Amino acid sequence: MRISELQNDQKNVNIGGVVTYVGQSRDVSLKSGSVEKVTTITVQDDSGSIPVNIWGSMIEKIKINSEIRLEKGYINEFRNQIQFNLGYYGKLFILLNSNTE
């Protein structure tokens, strides 16, 4: 699916693109009491870009200019902007990892 076609509340969404931004990771306290790292990246295709929340060990694998594919995610709105989220069943595939940071 093209990024420009994404809408709030979509489920089971697959997108692909290039990572154009990787934010600082931060610790988030979960309802279970555990703490998990999360960061926001931006993924861009030829139709647009979207923020994506990346959790845990996936953070270390993502670099700027990496070509990735995200599967089984969902779209929600946060601060009047849609964003892509990888849920429990979501998958991240790195198709091409750039050495550029």
Regions found by a protein language model. Give the residues of each.
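Short nucleic-acid-contacting surface segments enriched for D/E, G, S/T with interspersed K/R
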Residues: 56-71
